[in-house]
Amino acid sequence: RIMEEDNKKRQLQRAVSVFMLVVCLSAIAGGLGSATFSNYFKEVYHVDSAQRGFLEIPRESPGVLCALIISALAGFSDIGIAAVSQVLVMVGLMVMGAFSPSYGMMMIFLFIQSLGMHLFMPLNDAISMDLAREGEVGKTLGNFKSKANMCTMVTAFVIFAGYRWGFFSFEDKILKP
């Protein structure tokens, strides 16, 4: 019985560590996107303020649709949906960043990236609470959130420094379509 409890504790700790890595990587990806989107739209697509406002439709409509989408996926596990959401974020960011697609295609991939991000937000908290020890839900949520915020801040600083000192640029495409 004692070995069984020790085994459960180790499994829980491993799950917490793996999910902490996922949360940190997700925060880094989110930091890369949120810290650069406005400049990306301006430099690559030369959007004005009205167009920038219009871009909020594909960026925020997944948030409105999220309740419907999550309820439609209720038969799937939180971990499975979270994994799919991260793939959506990655595909959206990679296509926009590496290929700088046409304006219309960019809006589609912005929607895809945002859909993944909006799906992950509520699942992040749900999975965090599932991984909490009894009586430590608040502490566990705080721990995950603080690490995510730290990763986002470090990423924002790296983005700032990279553009400030010329390591990053919107002018060069990594891959040409």
Where are these regions (language model features)?
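Helix-loop boundary and gating motifs at the non-cytosolic
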Residues: 6-63, 148
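Glycine-rich segments within core transmembrane alpha-helices of 12-TM secondary carriers
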Residues: 139-160
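Intracellular juxtamembrane helix-capping segments at the cytosolic ends
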Residues: 37, 119-132
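Hydrophobic core of transmembrane alpha-helices in multi-pass small-molecule transporters
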Residues: 24, 92-94, 104-120
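Cytoplasmic membrane-interface "Motif A"-like loop-to-helix N-cap segments
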Residues: 72-87
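Transmembrane alpha-helix termini and helix-breaking/packing motifs in multi-pass membrane transporters
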Residues: 43-44, 67-75, 97, 154-176
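C-terminal ends and interior cores of transmembrane alpha-helices
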Residues: 87-101
